[in-house]
Curated annotation (Swiss-Prot):
It is found in: Secreted; Host cytoplasm; Host nucleus. Effector that acts as a broad suppressor of cell death to interrupt plant immunity. Inhibits cell death induced by cell death-inducing proteins, including the PAMP elicitor INF1 from P.infestans. The keyword Secreted applies. Keywords: Host cytoplasm, Host nucleus, Secreted, Signal, Virulence. A motif (RxLR-dEER) lies at residues 49-64. Belongs to the RxLR effector family. The RxLR-dEER motif acts to carry the protein into the host cell cytoplasm through binding to cell surface phosphatidylinositol-3-phosphate. The gene is RxLR9. Its main location: secreted. Residues 1-17 form the signal peptide. This is Secreted RxLR effector protein 9. It comes from the Eukaryota. The lineage of its organism: Eukaryota, Sar, Stramenopiles, Oomycota, Peronosporales. InterPro entries: RXLR.
Length: 116
């Protein structure tokens, strides 16, 4: 009986947390404040933040630099493409991390006298 009670409380807590995260008006205000121009890339910026999850700890300046870098490369993302670009960024960063960990592992496997 006690196990069932703990299980039910955990479900209710999870549902309450997820519904409050979705319906929290502070999140909506936070995301709408970031729209500074009707430019499509700015809309993609906001859409990407919504899809990644908006919280106060997001480094907005770093994301703005990434957005400016994209603008100079003449990449303009529509809001529908924001999810794809966020996914591709995550994929490329994971790929870089994997390559660097492989290099570090190879460096450890090579004896010190054979390193260049």
């Amino acid at each position: 009986m006690r196990l069932i009670y703990i299980f039910m409380v955990s479900i209710v807590t999870t549902l309450h947390a997820s519904s409050s995260a979705i319906l929290d008006p502070n999140d909506v205000k936070f995301t709408t404040k970031n729209v500074e121009s009707p430019d499509s890339s700015d809309a993609a910026y906001v859409a990407g933040r919504i899809l990644r999850g908006t919280d106060g700890n997001v480094n907005r300046e770093q994301e703005r630099k990434i957005l400016l870098k994209r603008k100079h490369k003449r990449h303009y993302y529509k809001p529908s493409h924001a999810h794809d670009s966020a996914g591709s960024e995550a994929f490329h960063s994971a790929k870089k991390a994997l390559k660097s960990s492989i290099r570090a592992t190879k460096a450890r496997l090579v004896p010190p006298y054979q390193r260049r």
